[in-house]
Amino acid sequence: FFSDIFNNIENYVFLLIDYGYSEREFYHPERSSGTIQYYKNHKKIKDSLLNQGNFDISISVDFSRVYRIANLFKLQLMSYTTQEQFLLNTNILENSEKITDVFTRNNILKSLLFPTDMGENFKIMILCDHMKSDFIINFKDYRHKL
């Protein structure tokens, strides 16, 4: 997969957004049964045997592994951060003011930003083939966790 992408394009920024963890978190004993999760209507389902075929299946990304693969292709890691940090630093609060219904706006922001929702569970990894020295990403940096 990565070979097909990174060997055939130049001058790019690769943005990976998904559920996931660093290696230490990914293989934590708490997740000894894996990271597979089932969702229906944006709600987690505990019993996957009920309503088979009527839910989404999600498996978390091992971002440390992605980082090691990126190194094989000599890619630069520009950023590794949480969805919360990414969205806050790309002006989600200002942009959300366009949503006039305060209740709706607050529910959307809560879902996207709160650590117990998507804010900490989704990670953002930004890779590129040539680091631009004048391009600075000011997100809270979690690269040390990889």
Where are these regions (language model features)?
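Long, Lys/Arg- and hydrophobic-enriched amphipathic alpha-helices
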Residues: 1-146
